[in-house]
Amino acid sequence: MASVLHKLITPLACSSPEPPRNKVTVVGVGQVGMACAVTILLRELADELALVDVVEDKVKGEMMDLQHGSLFLKTPKIVADKDYSVTSNSRIVVVTAGVRQQEGERRLNLDQRNVNIFKHIIPLIVRHSPDCIIIVVSNPVDVLTYVTWKLSGLPMHRVIGSGTNLDSARFRFLMADKLGIHSSSFNGWILGEHGDTSVPVWSGTNVAGVNLQTLNPNIGTDFDEENWKETHKMVVDSAYEVIKLKGYTNWAIGLSVADLTESLMRNMNRIHPVSTMAKGMYGIGDEVYLSLPCVLNSGGVGSVVNMTLTDEEVAQLQGSASTLWDIQKDLRDI
């Protein structure tokens, strides 16, 4: 007797279903991982979403919760497992797994603990999706992006750190808020390390083409009577403040990662400050990943914009690179 399925549907295609073309995997289903997953779903960037986590019940519960909302989404397939075979044929893999940053803990203190985790997960990602682009989100993101590049064997343009894309968004929001305009109308960049030694490019801040340094030559310096420099300090401290208030950060970084995913998936050639290999640029001699203005397309980092910086900004960027190298050179087993 024929089933309801066979009575209802007559198949026409003889071949098996095609593999996904725009599959995204999120590794780690903590607060950050799920914020990334949800924002990617809401922005309709994937035809399949895979979730992976070492805690099997947690990852399957998150999968079911999202599947139950499928009616309200445009992603037809959501899968999850602790086995990395579920990630096969991913175009983009977002890595959020790692030890959570604690209140008052500086990002660079997380290094070796998270390196040991990456030694397990990165080879598995590459085994199942050898052509993928990896976006590293786990902190300390610049160090772990370098570690991912070393462990993966992928070309450097396909290993990207979320970097200062979020720092720059925070900077633009805080500066625009003081000016009474929308953050999209303020143009400003933060480069270097995602965190304590990040570099605000005050020389490039502008609104509608009006460079703020021409209005206030001391902007961002210790001699600035308006104390705009405090805005960058607020950017650096903002994650610690949010962690102090709610225990973790997740929504802003999730939105930031979805923004990067869109530029990559849709071949947009948009420019983002993300963590990339900086050796040979701005006098940086060591193999470090830090944020520079990168053109993102379907191949990963297509190119890097040679931003005009002041001598002081270059020195700060070199200092940021030195800070990261001092950590990296002591890492074990990568």
UniProtKB/Swiss-Prot annotation:
Expression by tissue: Eye and liver.
Keywords: Cytoplasm, NAD, Oxidoreductase
Pathway(s) this gene product operates in, as recorded in its UniProt entry: Fermentation; pyruvate fermentation to lactate; (S)-lactate from pyruvate: step 1/1
Enzyme Commission number(s): 1.1.1.27
A Gene Ontology molecular function term of the record: L-lactate dehydrogenase activity
Principal EC category: oxidoreductase
Pfam families noted in UniProt: Ldh_1_C, Ldh_1_N
SUPFAM superfamilies in alphabetical order: LDH C-terminal domain-like, NAD(P)-binding Rossmann-fold domains
Gene Ontology CC annotations of this record: cytoplasm
Active-site residues, Swiss-Prot/TrEMBL: 194 (proton acceptor)
Residues where substrate binds: 107, 139, 170, 249
Subcellular location: Cytoplasm
Binding residues for NAD(+): 30-58, 100, 139
GO biological process: lactate metabolic process
Catalyzed reaction equations: (S)-lactate + NAD(+) = pyruvate + NADH + H(+)
Domain of life: Eukaryota
Quaternary structure note: Homotetramer.
Family: Belongs to the LDH/MDH superfamily. LDH family.
The protein's name in its UniProt record: L-lactate dehydrogenase C chain
Gene name of the record: ldhc
